[in-house]
Amino acid sequence: MTGDRRDEYYWKAKKEQLRSRAAFKLEFLLDRYRVVRKGDAVIEIGSSPGGWTQVLNSLARKIISIDLQEMEEIAGVRFIRCDIFKETIFDDIDRALREEGIEKVDDVVSDAMAKVSGIPSRDHAVSYQIGQRVMEIAVRYLRNGGNVLLKQFQGDMTNDFIAIWRKNFSSYKISKPPASRGSSSEIYIMFFGFKAP
């Protein structure tokens, strides 16, 4: 094993023909926490280049993937290129669900993140804003009992973020997968058992 995890997981992804090393983070989280189960319908936010999508595609019955950047096609995956902060995102998701014959989804997962600035407080604040938007989308489209998985840079607003949203769910977990760099403040927050209004 090299001293740099980025090298280890980069080459492992290449060997296994995965589009990004982030795939191993999701594999770890799914194996340990079962956030997504076989046959689930999933909305994936921040999908490009498709590492998570490849992993999800072996498990989910239907995936609607969303990203601001283009993503090379993956068979069986519905891709929406859109900024999640634009109000048109709801029309786009509504249309995709309707055309796929889905009323509500089982899970919403997100690896979305803006380009890192290198200033921890700024990166945390941006990740908080993205997380808020992911949760707004999640509570709109999740079925009763559904789950959420999202990335955030840990910081002084993390506890507030969890406090805001945990009341809508039965439980939550926080994890940092082995494929995450040790020096990174990156964490993954999972909410389980959505309590539909």
From Swiss-Prot:
GO MF, one example: rRNA (uridine-2'-O-)-methyltransferase activity
The protein's Enzyme Commission number: 2.1.1.166
Localization of this protein: Cytoplasm
Pfam families: FtsJ
Residues where S-adenosyl-L-methionine binds: G50, W52, D67, D83, D111
GO CC field: cytoplasm
Catalytic activity: uridine(2552) in 23S rRNA + S-adenosyl-L-methionine = 2'-O-methyluridine(2552) in 23S rRNA + S-adenosyl-L-homocysteine + H(+)
InterPro entries: RNA_methyltr_RlmE, RNA_MeTrfase_FtsJ_dom, rRNA-MeTfrase_E, SAM-dependent_MTases_sf
Keyword Cytoplasm among record annotations: yes
Keyword tags: Cytoplasm, Methyltransferase, rRNA processing, S-adenosyl-L-methionine, Transferase
Residues at the catalytic site: K151 (proton acceptor)
Function per UniProt: Specifically methylates the uridine in position 2552 of 23S rRNA at the 2'-O position of the ribose in the fully assembled 50S ribosomal subunit.
PANTHER family found in the cross-reference section: PRE-RRNA 2'-O-RIBOSE RNA METHYLTRANSFERASE FTSJ3 (PTHR10920:SF13), RIBOSOMAL RNA METHYLTRANSFERASE (PTHR10920)
Similarity comment: Belongs to the class I-like SAM-binding methyltransferase superfamily. RNA methyltransferase RlmE family.
Protein name (Swiss-Prot/TrEMBL): Ribosomal RNA large subunit methyltransferase E
Annotated source species: Thermoplasma volcanium (strain ATCC 51530 / DSM 4299 / JCM 9571 / NBRC 15438 / GSS1)
